[in-house]
Every structure is written in C-alpha cells, then in structure tokens.
Amino acid sequence: MSGGGGGGGSAPSRFADYFVICGLDTETGLEPDELSALCQYIQASKARDGASPFISSTTEGENFEQTPLRRTFKSKVLARYPENVEWNPFDQDAVGMLCMPKGLAFKTQADPREPQFHAFIITREDGSRTFGFALTFYEEVTSKQICSAMQTLYHMHNAEYDVLHAPPADDRDQSSMEDGEDTPVTKLQRFNSYDISRDTLYVSKCICLITPMSFMKACRSVLEQLHQAVTSPQPPPLPLESYIYNVLYEVPLPPPGRSLKFSGVYGPIICQRPSTNELPLFDFPVKEVFELLGVENVFQLFTCALLEFQILLYSQHYQRLMTVAETITALMFPFQWQHVYVPILPASLLHFLDAPVPYLMGLHSNGLDDRSKLELPQEANLCFVDIDNHFIELPEDLPQFPNKLEFVQEVSEILMAFGIPPEGNLHCSESASKLKRLRASELVSDKRNGNIAGSPLHSYELLKENETIARLQALVKRTGVSLEKLEVREDPSSNKDLKVQCDEEELRIYQLNIQIREVFANRFTQMFADYEVFVIQPSQDKESWFTNREQMQNFDKASFLSDQPEPYLPFLSRFLETQMFASFIDNKIMCHDDDDKDPVLRVFDSRVDKIRLLNVRTPTLRTSMYQKCTTVDEAEKAIELRLAKIDHTAIHPHLLDMKIGQGKYEPGFFPKLQSDVLSTGPASNKWTKRNAPAQWRRKDRQKQHTEHLRLDNDQREKYIQEARTMGSTIRQPKLSNLSPSVIAQTNWKFVEGLLKECRNKTKRMLVEKMGREAVELGHGEVNITGVEENTLIASLCDLLERIWSHGLQVKQGKSALWSHLLHYQDNRQRKLTSGSLSTSGILLDSERRKSDASSLMPPLRISLIQDMRHIQNIGEIKTDVGKARAWVRLSMEKKLLSRHLKQLLSDHELTKKLYKRYAFLRCDDEKEQFLYHLLSFNAVDYFCFTNVFTTILIPYHILIVPSKKLGGSMFTANPWICISGELGETQIMQIPRNVLEMTFECQNLGKLTTVQIGHDNSGLYAKWLVEYVMVRNEITGHTYKFPCGRWLGKGMDDGSLERILVGELLTSQPEVDERPCRTPPLQQSPSVIRRLVTISPNNKPKLNTGQIQESIGEAVNGIVKHFHKPEKERGSLTLLLCGECGLVSALEQAFQHGFKSPRLFKNVFIWDFLEKAQTYYETLEKNEVVPEENWHTRARNFCRFVTAINNTPRNIGKDGKFQMLVCLGARDHLLHHWIALLADCPITAHMYEDVALIKDHTLVNSLIRVLQTLQEFNITLETSLVKGIDI
C-alpha cells in the first residue's frame, strides 16, 4: 500500500493511528455497491442451480424490486489522516468494508436518522489485530446531480413495478369494486418513495478511528463529540482539525497499569489499561450481553465457543454483534479463539458461511426476515444466536459446562446486585434505568460477589419466573442458604472516600465487567489448577518440536481426565481436543520461564500459583466442590485506584498552524478537513516532550514486542511466516481483492485444510486405539478412556458433516450427510423399481456362499441402504443429525465406513447435482485420499454403535451346532437358551424341537459374554452333544462363538443338563469384505478338541507343573490388569474367569495334575474330590476335632459353599459346579484359604499321586501367594454364573 508521510514515530505508542471519513463520492456519483453486486451474483448463480440464497427474500426477486432508497450504493474512503503509518499499514478495502458493511444508505426526512456507533476488528494474516470504531450519521444531499439520479431511479423502478405487478383484467374489475384499500406492498412502496420536489434526501457518512488497542468507550466519546460539534448550531471552541490532530498525535497510548485523561470537543475523556498481572483489556459492556440473551443462553453460547462449534450471531445492530462476540471471547480467558473470527460479516463475504471450518461470525439482519427465512449452508454443528429476539439454536449433544448450576448461581447473584434480571430483558432500557437509579455508594463489596447493600430488588422476585433459576433455588435451599435479602455491612476498609474521575454509570459498567470476568476466570483457574503436572515437555530441541508439534502428544489427557470428577468428563474430554487448548499447551511448552511467557499465560499461571499457596487446591487433592471467586475485591480496587488517580493527562487541543479562513464549516455537514495539517505529526513534538513521560513509550514498546525480542531473528521470522501461512489458509478471510479467482483460491485452501484435518484425525484415533489394544496385549501403558474415544468419534462425525456441507448447491435439512444419503436411497429405490439396477451378482454370490457348508449362518448382506434402514428404524433417534451420526458409528463398527462412503460418492450424477464444482466431494484426488484415510479404521475394532445406543432393540440370530456323529439328530428333549451380555441378558427362551436356528429381538445386550443352554431331559433320547453355539447381532454383524464340546444329559459326561458357555467375538475375514461370518475350522478351537469327548481326566492334555504355574499366573495377571483399566474400558471379567485361558481352566489343570486314574471305567471328576473333602471336614466338626480357630473358619466356609452349590436347583453338572465354586471363591477372596485347606486334607493323599502339584508344599505356597493378589479387587460376577444360588 502506498503511503505518504509517516505519522511520526516508529512504534505504536499513539492512542490512535488513523482518522477516516467514508461516504458518498459526489464526483463519481451513484454507483451500485459492487460488494452487494457480487453477493447478488452469487445468489443468482445459486438460484440458477436450483438453490435458495443465504437469506430468503420476503417476496421472490426482492433483490431486483427494492426501492432505490432501500438499495445499497458504493461507499468510498473519502479521506484518511495520516496517509500511512509504518507499524500499521492502512487497509483501505477492509476499513471501507467494515465502516459501512452494506455500503451507502439513503433516507428522506420521513425516516429515522439517529447516528449509529459500532466497533469492528481487522485481523491480519499473521493473526495480529487492529481495532476500528465508526460512527455513522446522515447528511443532507446537496448535489443536484445525485438528487436527480435518485429521482430517475425511482421513475424506472415504478415503471418496472407497474409492469411486473399489473393484475389481469378480471382482477382489475374485481379490485375496482372493492374499497380501494392499499395492499401492504403498495403501502411499503409509498412509504419508501422519493419526490425531488417535496422530499429532502439524506445519505450516510461515517467517521472512524483506527487504533492499536480496543478503548471502545473512549473512542466512542471522541466520535460522538465530533459529531455533536458539526450538528450543533454553535461552532466548537477550536476547529475540528485541532481535536483530531490532538487525538492522533498528542494523546499517547497508556502503558499497562496506567490511566489517561485527554480532552474531547466538549468534555474530558478517561481510559485506563489493566496492568500485566490483571485480566487483559476489555472495554465492551458485559451488561448488554446478559440483558439481550439472559444467563442461560450466554452459558450455552459460551460452551459452544469453548468447544469450537460454528457460531453465527444475527442482529440488525452491528454494535450488538461486536459486543456479544468480544464478550464471549473475553470470557474464555486464558484460552483464545483460534479460528475464523469476523464479528461483522460484510455483504461480500456471505459465501464464507460455506466455510467447512469452525468460525465465529456476525450476520447483519435487515429486521424484516425472521429465522425461518434464513437459509444457511450447514447447521449440523451450528450455534445460531438471534440476539435481537433473545433466541439461540444449539447443536445436538452439547455437553454441560462443569458445575453449571453453581456457576450460573454465582453469576446471577452479581447481575441481581446490579439490577439486571438473570433471565435477560428484551427491553434493555428498563434494566438500564434500574442500573442508573442505583447510587454508587450502594455498591458495597462483600469480598465475594459484589452484592448491593439494602438492594430493593428481591432476588426471589427476579428469579421466580425462570426455569433454570428455579433449579438453582432448589440447589441453594439444599445447601441451607436462604434466598431472602441479606444485610451486608459496609466494609470499614473499603475506599469509600475514593473519588473516581468518571461518571457513576461508567464506574458501574467497569465494576460489573470485572466481577463477571473474574468469576469466569476463576472457573478455569479451579478446573485447570494443576494442568502443568500433565504437560509433556518435549525431549528434543525447540526447533524440532515446533516442526513436528502436530504429531506430538504434549498433554497427558487420559491421566488428567482420570483425575476429574465424573460429571466433568463429557465437557472436558471434548474441550481437550480443541485447537484453543492445544495452542494454550503449545504456548506453555514454548515458554519455559516467566520472561518468555505469553502475557495471558503469565497472568493465568500466577493465579494458579496463588490458589496453591492458599491451599484451595493441590495436584494431589482434587474435589468437585464448587469454590466461589475470591479475587473480585482486589480487581475492583485496582480499577478504582486508576480512575481516582489519573497517571497522565494529555495536552489539550490547541490552534494549529492553519491559514486564515481554514477550519470553517457549515452546521449539519462534516467539513472537508485540511489534510496539510493532519497528514503529519509535529516534527519536534514539543507538546509531547513537555507533558508525556518518555519512559511511557519505551515501556509500552517493550511490552508489545517482548515475545519477539526474546527470539533470535531466524526463529522469529520462521514463526511469523508460519502464522501468516496458517492465517491465509483457513484461519481468517482476507477482506480485500475479492475477485472470483481469490474466492476460488480460498475454497481450494478449505479443501486442503479439510484433507489435512482428516489425515490428522484418523492418525490420532488409530494411534490412541491401537495403543489401548497394545495395552490389552501386555505392551505399553493405557492412554485413552472410553469418554475420550467417544469424543474422538464425535469429532470425526463433525468433520464429516463439514465436508458434506462444503459447496452445497441446495441445503436440505440440518445434516448434509444424511441428506445426501437420502437422495442416494431414493435413487436406488427408483432404479430398483424400474429394473435398471441389477442385483443378480449379489444374489448369486449369496447363494454360492450358502451352499459352501450346511453349518454356516445365513450370510449378512453388506448394504449401505440396509444400514440406513437400520438407523431409520430406531425410534429413539429423532433428528437428521442424530441419524447421520448413528450411521457413521454403525459403519465404523462394521468396518465399512470408507466402503459405504465410496459407494455413496460413486453416483457421480447425484454428486454433481448436489454440489458445486469447487466442493471437496468433487475434488477427485482429495476425495480418494480422504477415503483412503478412512479405510485405515478397518485395522482396529470399534464398538462405538453398540456402546452408545444401549436401549434400542436389536435382532439376534442363533445357530446351535450339535455333533452329527453321535446321534444328535435323534434328540427328543425340549431345549432352551439364555444369552447374556455386558448390558443385560435375555429371559430363558424355549427352542422348538429339532430347530437349530432362530432369530429373536431384545434390548441391546452389548458385547455378548455367556450363553446358558440346556434341556428338560424329556423323551426317549434326552442326550445332546453340542459342539458350539453362534450368536450374531443382525445390525452390527458381530458374531460370537461359544464353544461347548460337552454332553447335556443324565448319565453322560458329568451328568449336566445345562452348560454355561463363555464366548469370544470372531474376527472378520480381512481379505474379502463381503465374506459372511463362518465358523472357524474345528482345529482352531482347542477347547472343543479338549472337551469334545472327554470321558475321563486321563484323556485331557497333560501339563507339567511349570506350565500350570504359568497359566495360573497369566490368568491372575489378566484379572489384575482388568481392574487397573478405567472402569469404562474394562472388558468382560467373565472371559477372564471362565474363558479358554481363564482362572477356572487354570485351576482345573492344577487339580487334575497327579489325579489318580479311575478304575472300571468309572468317571471321576474334581468335584468328587471336593465333595469327599467336604464330608471329611463336616465329620471333624461333628466330632469337635478342631485344630485351630482360623482353620475351623476356613473349613466351615468351604463346606457351606460346597453344600449350597450341591443344593442349587440348576442341573449344571460336576464341572459346572467346580466353575461356580471357583467364581464364588474369587468373589469372596477365599480361594487361597481353600487351596491351603485342601493341601492339608487327608483325602488328598488317597486321590492324588505323590508327584501331584497339590501335594508339593512349595508349589502350593507359591500358588497361594499368587491368588492372594486378588484380595484387593472387588470382583462382581455375572448373573448367569451364580444364578440359582444365594450365598
């Protein structure tokens, strides 16, 4: 940008950098606003493609039918002073666009023409910000050419309108018979008319200050006094140039912790800047946000911002958009919004609502269209805030902020103390008048929350109408606190004699602001008081870490979450995944000592340190008890001291070196200023030298550049360059050079950003998931929790929604992904109906598989449409967004997400119809890479559908495989089956005779754990040899195999009529996706081999003592690991107890070792030995032969458990009874006692050989020590294992 003479000085030490005037250029005349023209072009192109514009018009084609007074015309930057300053190059496009976001506006004397003030922000590509403050007012148009042009436009418009809206002849006759009442449209036309002979035409003009810091109240006062000077009948004491020159060149920027007083046209202006150990500068009224939205809505919006949802603010007041946006981001301290931030979205950037990235933007409303007529490209993850109507729309599945009720209560108390109802007030003037009536002396600090002494506003009266506050009342009453008025004694140490130099209302705004901000800051200080403990410092040098930081894990999230109270987890697990938290931790790692620290981080860390010193919270002592803010009083006093004792008073405005006659102006018109005196500052600056301390400039300069000065030049340049690169990709839209090629380039950067995000997200999910599975296999340490995994999957769903929303032609429903799926479903149905879609290949393939083996379950077809139907049949899911997320979860669990999406996008005609050319889904290379990244999820097992939708009905298919070789077909009894899972179990279900397959429906059982199968022993041949049972979830396709290999029948095997089978999930075949679940070959199931025809223990595999010890050790180790996992990540304990390598099987091997061989073909089981031992000990007790009390207690417990198991009505057989005894012994921590008891029992000598493990005291003592490690765990048994026994 070309620049003229600099404004003097080489550092941003001045209060203001530029004074700007925008408005109508009478030399170029009336020009249609090209920004609005671009917007109309975009909307017209959407209309041609069958889409509706972003904002639906009240009448079709309104953009072309608007009266000339309602159209927008091109505004220009008419003047700026100085021309340029080196530290803040002037961005003409951005300033012009944001001063008058919709261009020029014309009005007549019949229209309201009140001046309107608004602030704005210009965010540069490197992330730095410049602040603007604009006052828009109306001036009478004196140019005859402009008035004539407007009159001509009206003639043309009326002629077009009459032609377009002329009624048919019949309608004309009908209308002539009516009373001649004007239609609403006609009334509107007349109201908006302009007649050059009788109307006065006014046009908008804007004066603006561009400043390095956001002193909003001071800048507003400067502009309003300047405007008052030109509208007042009496001229100001000095020419306007004197006041503008003074604020540009002679008013310094106050350094941290200082206050400043300078002169406006009519009165003094005061501003103060917080010190480096206070909360950062914030000069917008928090009061207005709570009045407009209410506490509940503010908290919901605050939560959405913290979780980085897309946020769209909507209001017809630019200043409201800015105030809400700035307030929400200020309340985030110490975190900072990292994404697109455009509180006032110019008309030319409406296409940016299509951005598939988190954003916080403000959209101007014309005051006529309601929410239903506002069409937005994507709404699945959108928080929509209609500020003017006190209304907010939230995304689904929004978690609650920790301790929300107590937090809301604390904020509500402060608001009530200032006369602001917590539920908000649509008529803000009422609340403002209450606040104005309060005397400053009534604002008495109570060291906690600034309650008002003797306030006439009864808290109950203020709150009784609000539902949210009603819940708070109940909470407060439970804690014993009354909601009645409290008498607050005045603090004798308060500074009641302290006289501040600003008016009372301004002081109250300062006080309310700091109280609310301190409470919010205190919440984060409490929640993250020990965050430093979990920061993972990099092992490599800073340069290497910075290069690879996106791939580095820099915060121990799992450990941090494991220490948090349970109610905090849904919010915190998602918050830890945000960019703002990642940047916060990056800052912490980059800054090793206080000198290096970012100013915001330094303030936060000092507060954390203070909390620790006060023993409020320590890293080793965590509590979920809500702790109120205690820093309000100190923060208030700091502000009051600065306002009472002004640190510096700038020099007063004075006459400049102007020619005689210059500086005159006509009242009501902002004059053309003398550029020769305003373009440069004073050469010697004698005024500044005389009045402003030189150290101000030096100190301020050092504070602003401290982080850059501490880096060497190469590092600084590198970091700045990267910041610019990131900003130019997806962080911030550039507000200039808005040509179609630039828009296309912006969209291309969005595509690249989406692909990069997809790559990083899939990698993160795989690393975390595979890390956890490695732990289950005994490698590494656990690093993920169930909540965290669920958060990552929810984040993936959000990403998919943003991808499917990018470049949409027609927005239908809140979920773009589900809308696309529905279109695909309709297309397939139509093709199937017309016969154009062949299904022969699928059917033949299925038939061929059915004929492979008779023992196969019917193949489960892989079908995108079928999975959609599963979701559509779930009544609990009501919304399109919920259905899309459920479908994604189901596809991930079935390892079909990439395949399904590839199939969805294979319909190229549909994709072209739904999406514009620049959309991500129409970029072939990026789309292929995206699908490839998703394919990597097939390497891990997710249960993200099963574990989330726990209450839905699931169809299950059962296949029972009996032994054909041993007469299974002659079975005459009536079998039954009962299936158990982690979430519940079925009732006993009768199986029709000779039926081996059946399907049933029940509530989701979760991961299946056991099957109980048995029969009633009826008929001539009531003996059944079952090889295995298979159960398949018909929605997820998960198939579980439950090996048996045992007889069910009296006189067969161990005489059992029922078995408890423990199953495991079968792994899918990786080589062919469509392959249905097959039963693995028999030789792959050792349990089936070992137990298929186990008539006597001699036939079982022989293990030596070392192998037995190893198997018991592994079984116990598996149980120990189970209890060291987070509770939600613990798998099936039943599998660890009764599974193939479980504790029961290992102890069975121990008792079988050295067991004497049976004679005369008599079957002998371990249970026979245990029953004899029971008889022996009962005999001893009857004979009162008691060696010792401890021994007596153990023997009595053993006999009681064996007797109870023998008396159970279940026919579970001798091996089943042994399994039950081991499970009960593990539950009650008695196993090691029983092992010692049985080792000393004389029965052991008769039934075991000398080499038996149980007769080797060394091995027995080793076994006892291993089993003792289970004593510290609370083992809960599945119902199926202990059914029928009450002990």
From Swiss-Prot:
**Positions bearing Phosphoserine:** S193, S1085, S1087, S1096
The PTM Phosphothreonine maps to: T1079
UniProt subcellular location: Golgi apparatus membrane
Q: One Gene Ontology cellular component annotation?
A: Golgi membrane
Ranges for domain cDENN: 278-414
Q: Which disease is it linked to?
A: Developmental and epileptic encephalopathy 49: A form of epileptic encephalopathy, a heterogeneous group of severe early-onset epilepsies characterized by refractory seizures, neurodevelopmental impairment, and poor prognosis. Development is normal prior to seizure onset, after which cognitive and motor delays become apparent. DEE49 is a severe autosomal recessive form characterized by onset of seizures in the neonatal period, global developmental delay, intellectual disability, and additionally cerebral calcifications and coarse facial features.
UniProt-recorded name of the protein: DENN domain-containing protein 5A
Q: From what organism does this protein derive? A: Homo sapiens (Human)
